[in-house]
Regions:
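Short histidine-centered beta-strand/loop micro-motifs
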Residues: 29-32, 71, 107-108
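Conserved interaction-surface patches within small, structured recognition/assembly domains
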Residues: 59-71, 77-85, 100
Length: 177
């Protein structure tokens, strides 16, 4: 199916916003949010954006980048905003903006950014689930979407490297000779 026949959705149609308080059980030895917990929040939020855009089940193909910019302290809130920023035929890139807020002062800050790639899963085994094209609306969406092709090219280059790398990694148990 040619691109001109594909449905087009606005980035904002896939937008998801999820907010959590950083509780004592969520923190590491530095008294900041444990990175793995944030990764889980990001993947959860981004997967909803991808499903909302494609109206299908999705799987996480890769967490392409996660840049930690500012620690999220205990009793602050963490707000993840995600939306689709680029698509292939069955894949979708989702951008996540992670904002922190000091709930005592109201100070807000950019804590992290992330790009994740998802693949739409067809209901019928062996079929491909074509995803709609995406069109940005806001200044931020346009800025982020404009970089999609460059990020995709970088992912493809990295993917080739990692596929070759994985072929040389042993699957033997570490305690066997």
């Amino acid at each position: 199916m040619a691109d001109q026949n594909r449905e087009v959705k606005k980035s904002w149609e896939s937008k998801v916003i999820q907010t959590h308080r950083v509780f004592p059980g969520d923190i590491n030895s530095h008294r900041t949010l444990f990175g793995g917990r944030l990764m889980s929040y990001i993947d959860d939020t981004a997967s909803i954006s991808a499903s909302r855009h494609s109206r299908s089940d999705v799987v996480t193909a890769s967490m392409d980048t996660l840049d930690f910019l500012h620690p999220l302290n205990e009793n602050h809130s963490v707000c993840i905003e995600s939306y689709v920023t680029g698509v292939g035929s069955t894949s979708m890139e989702v951008f996540c903006k992670i904002m922190g807020e000091d709930l005592s002062s109201g100070e807000r800050y950019l804590a992290a950014t992330s790009f994740i790639t998802f693949v739409a899963v067809a209901k019928e085994k062996g079929k491909k689930q074509l995803v709609p094209l995406v069109e940005p609306s806001t200044k931020e969406e346009k800025f982020v979407c404009e970089g999609y092709e460059a990020r995709k090219a970088q992912r493809m280059s990295s993917r080739s490297f990692h596929e070759q790398f994985a072929q040389t990694i042993t699957d033997q148990l570490p305690w066997s000779n």
